[in-house]
Amino acid sequence: MSSPASAYLFSGLKVLDFASFIAGPAAATVLSDFGAEVVKVEPPGAGDPHRYLYRTPPNPALKENYTWQLTNRNKRSLALDLKNPKSSEILKRLVGWADVLVTNFPPRVRRRLKLTYEDVFPFNPRLIYADITGYGELGPEADKPGFDITAFWARSGLMQFTRDASSPPAVPVPGIGDHATAISLYAAIVTALYRRERTGEGCCVSTSLIANGAWATAAWLQAALFGAKFSGEIDRKNPPNALTASYRTSDNRWVLILFVEEDKNWPVFVKAIERADLQGDPRFADSKSRHANAAALVAELDRLFASQPLANWTALLDAASLPYGVVQIPEEIVKDPQLFANRIVVPINDGSANPRYTVDSPFMLKEQPKVAPGVAPELGQHTDQILKELGFDADQIDDLRAFGAVPHVPHSEASL
């Protein structure tokens, strides 16, 4: 059963989502999860390019637009050509209506569209203007296009730090850096809203993919800043530490052991696997010896883990209360009971008797309800409705269509 609108934390908060792809729109999605009203503004014709990203390999194949549903639930869509001079009055009224504006246009594009903070602030001095860039607002690359994989993963060094010495850098799952950056922008917006409560004034907040990539890799980036010596790429066959590594089981699965408290965990592990010979081996007698002989220990553990299936190893490691993780496959992830017990995945409110599920935003407030995820909008689905709410009458809307500021009909994604 859904809660009344007034029960949500951000009921009455109005958000304009001018952003594209994932990071900016996902920040607006988190606001919508707590009751904010979000209007997604898209160019007529193709709309947000993220509408079609799911069709691009190596994304999993499905006719239904799963990525769009995830990032744009609980939003209304307004198709608006910001390049059209007739759109200026619509933009002015939208900004006057809004509490928050989210964009990820590069600075030069914002200037061209008259969508900078300085352009829109006079329309609404209480506006929270939130922007994301690839490489930051300043510097020689401020206008450089940036994506999750290029600015968050590659530029920050994450790709280098996580790759195996025998392999080139792996292309990660799309959106990992975007979703991390979205939470940063959400935090910035909420901080600015708190400031507005105290001062009555709006402000501009920003973050970038490269900043969040640097924050994600900060433990080792800080080491570099202090002049630490790096051992080079991690070689799985000869790592710095064989007890923080992944091992293949007899049924071709992978289990990651993470014995951070090595001197405490090692004797427990050796006892659990009934390998007293390893305990007595001088090569593995203490942490210093194990690190010096990591390649030999990897060879021993490779043979050991390859001797039994995954289920045997999880039972043994659980019984010994040792820290480990199973490298899950998609079929397991979507059935993981922890995801359902903690409402990490939640049903989509689409009126179906057999609801499908989506990933919820990654935090909750006790005794504070979240909005049930609704179906993401078609391009321009709510254009007329929103224009009427802004005070445009039928004749004015017809004129806007005649001049091309808004499309004549909503677009169906399937027709594009």
Where are the model-predicted features located?
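Short Gly/Pro-enriched turn/cap motifs at secondary-structure boundaries
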Residues: 68, 234-239, 245-246, 353-356, ...
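N-terminal helix-loop segment corresponding to the beta1-alpha1 unit
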Residues: 1-201, 348, 378, 384-416
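Short, well-structured beta-strand/strand-turn elements
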Residues: 38-41, 318-332, 393-398
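A short glycine-threonine-serine/GTX helix/turn-capping micro-motif
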Residues: 170-180, 202-204, 234-244, 255-256, ...
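A glycine-rich dinucleotide-binding beta-alpha-beta segment and adjacent secondary-structure elements
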Residues: 319-373
